[in-house]
Amino acid sequence: MAKTALITGASSGLGAEYARQLAARGAHLVLVARDRAALDDHAARLRRTYGIEVEVLVADLLKPRQLAKVVARVADPERPVEMLVNNAGFGLPLAFERNDIEDEVEHLRLHVEVPMRLTHAALGAMLGRGHGRIVNIASVAAFIPRSTYGACKGWLVGFSRWANGRYAPSGVTVTAVCPGYTHTSFHERIGLPPGQEGVPDALWLNARDVVSESLRDVSRGRPVSIPSLRYKALVALARFAPPALASRLGERGR
């Protein structure tokens, strides 16, 4: 088990669940998010419940100086991070042509540039120690045409596959986790209340199962983790589906 895990987007959703499950396994934590109150509350509960050390690092990862602070923490040789979970992200509410282009650029930076910078910092430290794990939270949208969101997640999957092949022999594994629709506050933040996402009930997953299954794949050093059999089947179908059908699949929900 990782001695210390750093998790971005750790105040809610999958990030908060990764923190809970890693704490239950004995990992100390560095929690990164913008909301200090939510981070402090979550950290206090984790310390109280699991008796672990929790460091809170408040940062807006789209602000260069604040991102640099997190990069420095990841690379700090005196306080080694054994697992990096690149989880921070957000969705956009409209079709590409209707979104503000500056919102699209920030979306691209948070989903691609930020994990690339943090991964680069982590690799320098982890390779020097000869061990470490990097977890990039992608999505099944990586395998289905899905505007810029799917394109960003596709980059994460391709990058993680390559990085795992290159660095796993040196003791550092890189895994892209590709959940399907998961019950978190993600959709509400883009204006889709529960029940209005346009997604059949059978396709919804819960965060606890997504994180548990993905951590099992991470521990095995797999380059890609697709939690749940139903989404493994959906991804397999998408690989062989005609382009028109794959595009229609990508129009469901967010």
Region annotations inferred by a language model:
Residues 25-42:
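Conserved glycine-rich Rossmann-like NAD(P)H-binding loop of the short-chain dehydrogenase/reductase
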Residues 87-92:
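Conserved NAD(P)H cofactor-binding loop of Rossmann-fold oxidoreductase domains
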Residues 95-97, 103-108:
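Substrate-binding pocket helix/loop in short-chain dehydrogenase/reductase
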Residues 119, 152-155:
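Active-site helix of classical SDR
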Residues 176, 197-234:
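C-terminal helical subdomain
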